Regions:
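Glycine-rich dinucleotide-binding loop and its adjacent helix/turn
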Residues: 106-143, 147-154, 262-269
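Glycine-rich FAD pyrophosphate-binding loop
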Residues: 34-51, 166-175
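A conserved FAD-binding loop/helix module that cradles the flavin
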Residues: 281-316
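FAD-site-proximal beta/loop scaffold in flavoenzymes
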Residues: 122-131, 239-288
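Active-site-proximal substrate-binding core of FAD-dependent oxidoreductases
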Residues: 272, 302-341
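Beta1/beta-strand and adjacent pyrophosphate-binding region of the FAD-binding site
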Residues: 11-24, 140-145
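A Rossmann-like FAD-binding core segment of flavoenzymes
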Residues: 62-88, 95, 161-251, 261
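N-terminal Rossmann-like FAD-binding beta1-loop-alpha1 element of flavoenzymes
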Residues: 16-38, 154-158
Length: 415
């Protein structure tokens, strides 16, 4: 017998609805609730916390006493102003709100190269998440490659859980990283954090101006070929954890018609978007790290709850954290040589098996979708979209509901 799916129309109207239960969403919900607002929080994970806070570090008991949490739920459409359509495992729900805070976070940027679709080649954060969920990595040979501080955090975690981390391949130049490190002198907390990462990685090779050019194996990954200073070599490994920075998850804000900036969703001083009563906070406005996400979430929470003076007290802290985020972006920006990674027969869209040669025959996203089905598979362009924006300069196509894959029955509104 198939599982039954119930349709529910919520009679409650929340003052503030927060989408996303990562650091920015948690901070927003906390400040809105303490300001007296009736708050709902929606997240597609089983527990709040996002990719940063999990398990015992998540303040779940407090949240559930102050905020109505809809875990394991995801927004797939906005059928009318002030209404969200949610899908859960066995039910659909319409949630009503007066103000909306979108803290949808970011995802890893993947760049295609020969062999990147082999089993055991995965995102750096993805491998860490799987390890947290029980994937056995003890004794496994792992190469961590890509760009940014996330590589260090992932390598430290994997090593701490028994993995044999062979090396970290950072595509940024040592000079750029050195300049970034000098800037940490003005931020003692960040400097201490960086020192702790390095201490946890003693004995692991950290190679700058280095990146993977091919993953090799028959049925699964067996080795990765790396390039540095014009030389190449092959490193045997069981896993390749690869990530070239992060991409803001702007699909839901785009569905609402929010204006975009060069870095993400455009917001004003109070984190309000171009659409009235809709706010954005955290990585969705631009990649900035944990501290910036927290303060942006607090500002959005206060503002959405009608406390602009409290929000204004946090502007200085946000400015400082934005300066750090800008330095981070400049230091670890993907180099131009990475555009040469995919070969003609390299799959760019792994969902629909579309090669780079076929995609290059098109001039934009819409044409590629029509002629090759690129971006029309289960991930809806979330993997190939970021890659093609970097490789070919294509901007994301317009967003239409459902924002995420949804059951056919979910698309029929209740009642």
């Amino acid at each position: 017998m198939p599982d039954t799916v119930s349709n529910v129309v919520s009679n409650a109207t929340f003052d503030v609805a927060v989408i996303g239960a990562g650091p920015a969403g948690l901070a927003a919900a906390a400040r809105a609730a303490e300001s007296g607002a009736r708050v709902a929080m929606v997240d597609d994970n089983p527990r709040p916390g996002g990719q940063i806070w999990r398990a015992s570090r998540t303040p779940e008991p407090w949240l559930r006493s102050q905020v109505e949490v809809f875990s394991g739920a995801r927004v797939f459409a906005a059928p009318e102003p002030g209404v969200l359509a949610l899908e859960r495992s066995h039910s659909n729900l319409e949630l009503r709100y007066r103000s909306l805070i979108l803290a949808t976070g970011a995802r890893e940027r993947f760049l295609p190269f020969p062999g990147w679709t082999l089993p055991n080649v995965m995102g750096a954060g993805g491998l860490q998440a799987l390890a947290k969920s029980g994937l056995p990595i003890n004794g496994k040979r792992i190469v961590v490659a890509g760009s940014g501080p996330l590589l260090l955090a992932v390598a430290k975690y994997l090593r701490g859980h028994g993995a044999d981390v062979r090396l970290i391949a950072e595509q940024a130049d040592s000079s750029a990283i050195f300049r970034f490190g000098l800037g940490l002198i003005a931020k003692p907390g960040k400097l201490i954090q960086a020192a702790q990462f390095r201490a946890g990685l003693l004995g692991i090779r950290y190679l700058t101006a280095c990146w993977p050019i091919a993953a090799r194996g028959v049925e699964r990954l067996e080795s990765v070929t790396l390039q540095r200073n014009g030389k190449t070599w092959t490193e045997p490994c069981d896993y390749l954890a690869c990530g070239f920075g992060l991409i803001p998850n702007v699909e839901l804000p785009a569905l609402f018609g929010c204006r975009m900036s060069e870095t993400g969703v455009a917001v004003d001083d109070y984190q309000q978007t171009s659409v009235a009563a809709i706010y954005c906070a955290g990585e969705v406005t631009g990649i900035g790290g944990l501290d910036l996400a927290l303060v942006e979430g607090e500002i959005a929470g206060y503002a959405a709850a009608g406390k602009p003076r409290d929000a204004g007290k946090l502007f200085a802290a946000r400015k400082s954290n934005r300066q750090f985020a800008g330095a981070l972006e400049r230091a670890f920006a993907p180099r131009a040589e990475l555009r040469n990674l995919p070969q003609d027969d390299t799959f760019v869209c792994r969902c629909e098996d579309v090669t780079y040669a076929r995609v290059r025959q098109c001039s934009n996203w819409r044409e590629a979708k029509l002629h090759t089905r690129c971006g029309m598979g289960p991930c809806q362009g979330r993997v190939c979209g970021g890659a093609l924006e970097f490789l070919l300069g294509w901007k994301p196509d317009s967003v239409r509901p459902p924002v995420l894959p949804a059951r056919v029955g979910s698309l029929a509104r209740p009642g």
